[in-house]
Amino acid sequence: MRTYDDTFSGQRIYPGKGKLYVRGDSKIFRFQNGKSESLFLQRKNPRRIAWTVLYRRQHKKGISEEVAKKRSRRTVKAQRAIVGASLEVIKERRSMRPEARSAARLAAIKESKAKKQETQAAKKAEKAKNAANPKARVTSKQGAKGAPVKVAAKSR
């Protein structure tokens, strides 16, 4: 047996009962009785009429079975290794004292600064070596092809 739901009240409509209302835009509405049809045509909001299914759902009426609230699962933080550091290394760093950590940090900074200075010194030495023996002047491609050399103006 096929049943339909009332579009206004949400109640069940059994075969041979109710009315079918077709709007101008071809949307079909099914009403269980004249009461729900009348309220629909008056453009009443079913969420504000106490006996409709929509109102009862919105105001949590008649749901006595769900007394116990649903418990949500608590999220638990899990430590995972990341690229470049295993879990043991991470745990070791976490357990270090702040003083030891700052000392290790300063040592690492000092080491990186020394390395940087070293590379800069090497660059400077390379530059000085290149400046000591200059290469021949760079000639333009046009000149090499035999283009006439532009003579500087002497009248001024």
Curated annotation (Swiss-Prot):
PROSITE patterns: RIBOSOMAL_L24E (PS01073). GO terms for cellular component: cytosolic large ribosomal subunit. Keywords: Cytoplasm, Ribonucleoprotein, Ribosomal protein. GO terms for biological process: cytoplasmic translation. InterPro entries: L24e/L24_sf, Ribosomal_eL24, Ribosomal_eL24-rel_N, Ribosomal_eL24_CS. Residues 110-129 have a biased composition (Basic and acidic residues). Pfam families: Ribosomal_L24e. It comes from the Eukaryota. Residues 130-156 have a biased composition (Low complexity). Residues 110-156 are annotated as: Disordered. SUPFAM superfamilies: Glucocorticoid receptor-like (DNA-binding domain). GO terms for molecular function: mRNA binding; structural constituent of ribosome. It is found in: Cytoplasm. Component of the large ribosomal subunit (LSU). Mature N.crassa ribosomes consist of a small (40S) and a large (60S) subunit. The 40S small subunit contains 1 molecule of ribosomal RNA (18S rRNA) and at least 32 different proteins. The large 60S subunit contains 3 rRNA molecules (26S, 5.8S and 5S rRNA) and at least 42 different proteins. Belongs to the eukaryotic ribosomal protein eL24 family. PANTHER family: 60S RIBOSOMAL PROTEIN L24, RIBOSOMAL PROTEIN L24. Component of the ribosome, a large ribonucleoprotein complex responsible for the synthesis of proteins in the cell. The small ribosomal subunit (SSU) binds messenger RNAs (mRNAs) and translates the encoded message by selecting cognate aminoacyl-transfer RNA (tRNA) molecules. The large subunit (LSU) contains the ribosomal catalytic site termed the peptidyl transferase center (PTC), which catalyzes the formation of peptide bonds, thereby polymerizing the amino acids delivered by tRNAs into a polypeptide chain. This is Large ribosomal subunit protein eL24. It comes from Neurospora crassa (strain ATCC 24698 / 74-OR23-1A / CBS 708.71 / DSM 1257 / FGSC 987).
